[in-house]
Amino acid sequence: MNFHLTSKYKPTGDQPEAIRQLTDGIERGDRAQVLLGVTGSGKTYTIANVIANVNKPTLILSHNKTLAAQLYEEMRGFFPDNCVEYYVSYYDYYQPEAYLPTTDTYIEKDLAINDEIDRLRLRAVSNLMSGRNDVIVVSSISCIYGMGSPVALNENIIEIHRGQIIDRNALLRKLVGALYVRNDIELKRGCFRVKGDTVDISIAYSDTILRIIFWDDEIDSIEELDDVTFLRTAQFDEYKLYPANLFMTTEEQTNLAIRHIQNDLVKQIAFFEELGDGVKAQRIKERVEYDMEMIKELGHCSGIENYSRYFDGRQAGERPYCLLDFFPKDFLMVIDESHVTVPQIGGMYGGDRARKTNLVEYGFRLPAAFDNRPLTFDEFKQMTHQIIYVSATPADYELNECEGVVVEQLIRPTGLLDPEIEVRPTENQIDDLMEQIVQRTERKERVLVTTLTKRMAEEMSEYLLNHGIQTAYIHSDVTTLDRIKILEKLRNGTFDVLVGVNLLREGLDLPEVSLVAILDADKEGFLRSHRSLTQTAGRAARNVNGKVIMYADHITASMQLTIDETQRRRTKQLQYNEAHGITPTQIKKALKNSLSYGDSSDARELQRESTAKDLPTVAFAADPIVERMTRQQLEKCIEETTRLMKESAKKLDFMQAAQYRDEIIKLQKELELK
């Protein structure tokens, strides 16, 4: 099936030429191209046109979940008749296994999986395995992390057709082999139930039920049912059912893996004994033997991913399988905001390796744990054949890859100009900023304020709130789903001002924002580099009244570069507007949820309400006040402690996170007694 682009717009401005150049480059076989597109020029629409022209399965890589969700929603709008999928980390919370030698503290792995994102990941892989050509996967950096072997997954696809002669129990065994679980009481996702000659399967990667009706040993009917009403929505003559998990193995592979694990364990024990370190030798012996026993009896163990090399049949050092293995060789890769995403790809391997080094050196894991890892940058390059780097500020790496040939897209179809940039002194900057904010809020416009640190963002937010301005802050400690909701609340007017650090730069589509204020603009560094300033200024480029105020006591080289480049783009847009009689028009974008998965709590209101009349929202289980808490107060306490646990894990403060986790367990026991 071919891609079918649906849009009420036609390419205008620089878009037709950019689409033509990028399409020609792919058809020529160019390995790398750069699309330099300013904010609001329609880069996503251009890429959608290129995808439709070249008709190749496409992986769009974004550097965070928020932007990935935004791209996913836009691509679904452009290609409603094709497969547009979403593949990001399915962890709501993840604390990796770690060992801290300085305090001799071992932290066990702890996690919470988002069931809906797991379903979306499975659906993405299933559609790729189906052989369909019209598949677009929007992914975060998760696509370079290890997953199951494509061979093992393909071997567990269940193909059925009407009139097929197959014993019902044989089909049930196949379902179990594909990791579907029998549950005759509750038909949850990834489960099946049996009632007489009818087998109902809750498909792991869909929100539908597959009903198979037998007549003796013959499949008489294959139906699709709504998972709520159980009304029939479709009938099939044949059907392919894909596995319920991305990690598959067989009994034969498991037995072989255990033998290899045993051999490597003997070698590692001998290694530690040769060093005269009996404690580490005993530790690795006990841990691995326990894991092997669990695998034999239950088929899994805690941390089984550290043995993935044995189950996949890989050699030491051999790269893991990942999402890229499921794409055909000639797929198209689009790297959005490449100046940020490319360095992120390169940094994943080093961080993973550093954490596992302690686990291996101190006898907690076999050296095979190193092979459960993300791809290295070189491995990533070997697996990608044609890449389009998309950025308003491409870095030197991307420019070198395309040998300096850049496709520019500087004209906005709406006629909107790049924002005016004004430099103001830091003296009385807060009072000046307050005055500017009041002017914008009177016009029902929004303001972004960028600071250098998270603490400054929180304090600025608190200051503005105390002066009656509806304000929120956003930084790396705010969870992914909460971040999306906060941005929606900014757009719908719940907040007038959003204060942030680095998350207000790339790709955020906020047409209501007319002012971007950059505090400490002259503090040269990563957050105030030429590229960072240009990206930050671009957040005001979607509004007809867009303006940027840089608060600084002198103009740095980075500031000057940003001012000059912005002026060049303004001039080009003005000339285009005059030549075509265009009057700049305000972008109007419908308010809608980017992704509605999961039952995530609402974005925390960052205006902290007084809690003087309430009991504390965080308490330790040993505190006598816990006994006087109501059930509702305990639930609130658990929720807040969970938030603190997640924040500690993100900061790599594993000891603190583990303490919070233990308190949550105790508080939950108290809750059960209420």
Where do the language-model regions lie?
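Conserved pre-motif I regulatory segment
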Residues: M1-V34
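Pre-Walker A (Motif I) flank of P-loop NTPase domains
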Residues: E27-V34, K56-P57, N133-V135, E445-R446
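Walker A/P-loop
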Residues: R28-V50
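N-terminal cationic and glycine-rich segments that engage phosphates or anionic surfaces
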Residues: V34, Y87-D432, Q436-E442, S461, ...
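Conserved strand-helix element at the start of the C-terminal RecA-like helicase core
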Residues: P57-A69, Y86, K280, R440-E462
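Short amphipathic alpha-helical segment within the helicase RecA-like ATPase core
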Residues: A69-G77, E97-Y99, E459-Y463
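Conserved RecA-like helicase motor-core motifs
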Residues: D81-S89, G303, R446-L448, M460-D482
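Conserved helicase ATPase core of P-loop NTP-dependent helicases/translocases
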Residues: V478-G500
